[in-house]
């Protein structure tokens, strides 16, 4: 654990906070960046009082809440080693993808519902989108009747998932559709400082909050109470990245960026521009934005 005698302004803000919030945005496989950030936060003695996560960030948030961040890299490794395509799944789920099944297996092994329900578990709010009106809804994973279904709901996005999870009679979908950067919710929950971890590179423009706000500007009233940790440039990992060396590199990049932002260190490794897969990455972002934007269109009456 690092405890500098004269902490940087960012670290001083986080350590002096009476109620620190942590917000983990979505980003699919790019959320591997968050793994390194979480490791660094814990090493520096930064202990959030609340975590809010959406979409791909919910799996990392669940590990933090359950106290299993030390197992996160193995969690991701196990997930990526499982076959994610199965033609037979077309008959069962109307999709060749097995992501729901893989998530169920790895979550049970590396996190577990019972750990989320322990008294010492970190409060974890999962953001989902209520599909009938496209509104953001936040549910506490610790008290949810079925936490895993809640986590899957925050990731629901066709064609990777074909059946929208139903919770208490309502159908829910990807939490990033309604708000990919729910930091205002953290302040509304009484947090006096917030760490926001998101995956859009600084050189790509302001953070991505959603299809209607792809270049979000954080209001000044929030900026002074926030520490935003994001890559310098577009990540090499694609949204559907499965190459373990690339994901491992992204995790390590998260560690270094967290130290740069929080401690003021300088690491040349973080200033490397992504080269391979640039076109695929751009096309993936455009496709995802189009899918999410289509999901926000109001349904015709009747």
Predicted regions and their residues:
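Patatin-like phospholipase
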Residues: 1-54, 62-302
């Amino acid at each position: 654990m690092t405890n500098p005698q004269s902490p940087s302004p960012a670290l001083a803000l986080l350590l002096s906070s009476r109620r620190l919030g942590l917000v983990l945005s979505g980003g699919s496989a790019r959320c591997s960046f968050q793994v390194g950030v979480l490791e660094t936060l814990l090493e520096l003695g930064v202990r959030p009082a609340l975590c809010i996560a959406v979409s791909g960030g919910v799996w990392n948030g669940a590990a933090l809440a359950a106290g299993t961040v030390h197992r996160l890299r193995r969690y991701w490794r196990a997930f990526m080693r499982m076959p994610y395509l199965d033609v037979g799944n077309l008959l069962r789920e109307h999709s060749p993808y097995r992501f729901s099944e893989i998530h169920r297996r790895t979550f049970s092994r590396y996190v577990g519902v019972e750990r989320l329900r322990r008294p010492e578990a970190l409060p974890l709010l999962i953001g989902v989108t209520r599909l009938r009106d496209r509104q953001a809804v936040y549910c506490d994973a610790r008290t949810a009747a079925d936490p895993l279904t809640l986590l899957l709901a925050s990731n629901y996005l066709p064609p990777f998932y074909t059946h929208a999870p139903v919770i208490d009679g309502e159908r829910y979908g990807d939490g990033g559709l309604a708000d990919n950067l729910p930091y205002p919710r953290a302040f509304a929950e009484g947090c006096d400082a917030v760490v926001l971890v998101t995956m859009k590179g600084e050189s790509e423009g302001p953070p991505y909050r959603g299809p209607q706000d792809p270049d979000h500007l954080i209001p000044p009233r929030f900026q002074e109470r926030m520490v935003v940790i994001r890559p310098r440039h577009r990540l090499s990992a694609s949204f559907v990245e499965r190459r373990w060396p690339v994901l491992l590199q992204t995790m390590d990049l998260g560690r270094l960026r967290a130290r740069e932002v929080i401690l003021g260190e300088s690491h040349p490794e973080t200033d490397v521009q992504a080269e391979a897969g640039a076109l695929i990455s751009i096309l993936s972002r455009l496709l995802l934005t189009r899918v999410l934007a289509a999901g926000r269109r109001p349904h015709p009456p009747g």
